[in-house]
Amino acid sequence: MPSPIPVERFLPRDLSPSIDLRPCSSPLELSHRKLPGGLPACSGRPRLLPPRLAWCSIDWEQVLLLEPLGSGGFGSVYRATYRGETVALKKVKRSTKNSLASRQSFWAELNAARLRHPHVVRVVAASASCPGDPGCPGTIIMEYTGTGTLHQRIYGRSPPLGAEICMRYARHVADGLRFLHRDGVVHLDLKPANVLLAPGDLCKIGDFGCSQRLREGDEAAGGEPCCTQLRHVGGTYTHRAPELLKGEPVTAKADIYSFAITLWQMVSRELPYTGDRQCVLYAVVAYDLRPEMGPLFSHTEEGRAARTIVQSCWAARPQERPNAEQLLERLEQECAMCTGGPPSCSPESNAPPPLGTGL
């Protein structure tokens, strides 16, 4: 489908033409290169974190590298121990083509610092340097959740996700989004590959390398809170909200759109789009192109419920999408229907909350 306008103006020049389904903070391509048990001493004066993040500075004497887990995007991840606890250590890559993007990715990861939630990967410690690599933009130590992602669960050899599991996983992700948005953080790269599966079959949102913080005060003024950085150029194009493709300000509703694509993937077990990237992007913006709703979204009551949720969350206008609070309440209702138990959301109303109203 030819594009009558230059779609390139919506795209960062260094965006890969292929679908990037790989996260930075979860296991990817295994490397067979041996690692030393420890890290070399820092050379020169180490770069320090700002005072507000001094609490999480890495004590390098307590770091012991165990094995590489993988690499992708802006970082390489290792299994390690820190103060006797098994952790994931992410070393941000030094990019010769875009060093600014590498630094921005590191500082964006720290948007999750101090945050504690069952469905958000916890940042344990961080450093603006790395021993033996003075050019490294930074190092982040995170909780170790294991080696699985939601992407691997959807597209691997496991049986398809049943309705109950789909809704439970979706509820975990929505709960994590609600927490992040309440704290003023927008993830901006939500997709199955960035949702880690932890022990207890818990979903945890990870890889905050594209995240941004909302500006304070906008909500009180009656508008939707926007990010401090008005334009967004990162993330995965298949999950990027139409308003971001058009260069409009970033709001938390962009994560809701990405959630819709993610839930669609959980149900369908298919990739969102095929074909030329620029044609897809133009069609998403100009013609409201969305992934096709197959029979799985219409043959059962659960499928029809998922269809309603997905369609409300990927509405073209951000104002028509639910916020994370409304989304979680609706998913709680659906989980209760799947399990036959009472809903665990607020008992103020037994009816599903209206979707697409408010922030």
Curated annotation (Swiss-Prot):
It catalyses: L-seryl-[protein] + ATP = O-phospho-L-seryl-[protein] + ADP + H(+); L-threonyl-[protein] + ATP = O-phospho-L-threonyl-[protein] + ADP + H(+). SMART domains: S_TKc. Transmembrane segments: none annotated. It comes from the Eukaryota. Keywords: ATP-binding, Cytoplasm, Kinase, Nucleotide-binding, Proto-oncogene, Serine/threonine-protein kinase, Transferase. Its EC number is 2.7.11.1. GO terms for molecular function: ATP binding; MAP kinase kinase kinase activity; protein serine kinase activity; protein serine/threonine kinase activity. Signal peptide: none annotated. GO terms for cellular component: cytoplasm. ATP binds at residues 69-77, 90. The active site is at residue 189. It is found in: Cytoplasm. GO terms for biological process: MAPK cascade; protein autophosphorylation; signal transduction. CDD domains: STKc_Mos. SUPFAM superfamilies: Protein kinase-like (PK-like). Residues 63-336 form the Protein kinase domain. The keyword Repeat does not apply. PROSITE patterns: PROTEIN_KINASE_ATP, PROTEIN_KINASE_DOM, PROTEIN_KINASE_ST. Serine/threonine kinase involved in the regulation of MAPK signaling. Belongs to the protein kinase superfamily. Ser/Thr protein kinase family. This is Serine/threonine-protein kinase mos.
